[in-house]
């Protein structure tokens, strides 16, 4: 094979991530031609409703997966936080690249920190996870849905529709917009979405040649962390419909996983954490999920 076709969404961030993967593949496989196949997805097109209302983040994948099934693309690049906990057959993730910045960012043109926002300030985010943590920190805030790509969201802030918005640090950094980060929202006080900051490459599991071409990009330490986070989310039956957060980091030879379930309506947060082996990420994820259930997560999730 001399050409590899990467299906990608058309947003600037998706194109950056896909070109990042393409560049890495060219370096590992001299002589391989890598081309992008930009596509529009329903998740990109429907911006007047929340993702939960129109079917969840899996909408960002379906068109790209169909392109692979039709033979129009060999693989697809995704933000791993947008990838469902269970992939449909025959798809697999042969490569999870080294993780970028997992933190969230408060972006404001007027106020330096979350606590500096005035009483009743208007904050834009459609993420239930972010809404839950905002409600816990500042119950007075007016939280307003905000959809669209990074540049669209920044434009809405700059046009005066919001006092602040919350975005992912990694997205801003990848687009050369790190200067727009007003304040970092960091673990352990503020937890990101499972796998936030990680880029994954998806392909058909029955295509060994493509799988092997992509697998050279896999970052084992990142994979261990995000697999633990996603295992916790899976054990909670979580998706983008529920406010679930998780963050794993290496401590010596072990992983330390923090998890959270929250309520976007009243800011109640439940936390749990545990250490575990990087060779047993599924067990670690279930252990933290069990800790959340013991503290009442099932009741909180049932209220959603």
From Swiss-Prot:
It comes from the Bacteria. The modification S-(dipyrrolylmethanemethyl)cysteine is found at residue 240. Pfam families: Porphobil_deam (PF01379), Porphobil_deamC (PF03900). Pathway: Porphyrin-containing compound metabolism; protoporphyrin-IX biosynthesis; coproporphyrinogen-III from 5-aminolevulinate: step 2/4. It is an enzyme of class 2 (transferase). GO terms for cellular component: cytoplasm. Keywords: Porphyrin biosynthesis, Transferase. InterPro entries: HemC, Porphobilin_deaminase_cofac_BS, Porphobilin_deaminase_N, Porphobilinogen_deaminase_C, Porphobilinogen_deaminase_C_sf. SUPFAM superfamilies: Periplasmic binding protein-like II, Porphobilinogen deaminase (hydroxymethylbilane synthase), C-terminal domain. Binds 1 dipyrromethane group covalently. One of its GO terms (molecular function) is hydroxymethylbilane synthase activity. Its cofactor is dipyrromethane. GO terms for biological process: heme biosynthetic process; protoporphyrinogen IX biosynthetic process. It catalyses: 4 porphobilinogen + H2O = hydroxymethylbilane + 4 NH4(+). Its EC number is 2.5.1.61. The porphobilinogen subunits are added to the dipyrromethane group. PANTHER family: PORPHOBILINOGEN DEAMINASE. Monomer. Tetrapolymerization of the monopyrrole PBG into the hydroxymethylbilane pre-uroporphyrinogen in several discrete steps. Belongs to the HMBS family. This is Porphobilinogen deaminase. The gene is hemC.
């Amino acid at each position: 094979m001399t050409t590899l076709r990467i299906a990608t969404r058309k947003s600037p961030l998706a194109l950056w991530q896909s070109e990042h993967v393409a560049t890495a593949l060219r370096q590992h496989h001299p002589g391989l031609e890598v081309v992008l196949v930009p596509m529009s997805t329903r998740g990109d097109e429907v911006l007047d409703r929340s993702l939960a209302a129109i079917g969840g983040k899996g909408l960002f994948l379906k068109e790209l997966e169909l392109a692979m099934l039709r033979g129009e693309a060999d693989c697809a690049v995704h933000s791993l936080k947008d990838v469902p906990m269970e992939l449909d057959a025959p798809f697999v993730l042969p490569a999870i690249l080294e993780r970028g910045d997992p933190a969230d960012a408060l972006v404001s043109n007027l106020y330096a920190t979350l606590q500096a926002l005035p009483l009743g300030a208007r904050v834009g985010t459609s993420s239930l996870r972010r809404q839950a943590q905002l409600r816990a920190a500042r119950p007075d805030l007016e939280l307003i849905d905000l959809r669209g790509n990074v540049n669209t969201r920044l434009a809405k802030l700059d046009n005066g529709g919001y006092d602040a918005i919350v975005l992912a640090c990694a997205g801003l950094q990848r687009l050369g917009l790190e200067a727009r980060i007003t304040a970092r929202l960091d673990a352990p006080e503020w937890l990101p979405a499972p796998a936030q900051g990680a880029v994954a490459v998806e392909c058909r599991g029955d295509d060994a040649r493509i799988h092997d071409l992509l697998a050279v990009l896999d970052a084992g330490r990142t994979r261990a962390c995000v697999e633990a986070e996603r295992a916790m989310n899976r054990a909670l039956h979580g998706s983008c419909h529920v406010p679930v957060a998780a963050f794993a980091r290496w401590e010596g030879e072990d992983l330390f996983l923090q998890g959270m379930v929250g309520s976007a309506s009243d800011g109640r947060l439940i936390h749990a954490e545990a250490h575990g082996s990087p060779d047993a990420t599924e067990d670690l994820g279930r252990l933290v999920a069990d800790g959340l259930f013991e503290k009442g997560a099932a009741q909180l999730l049932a209220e959603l």
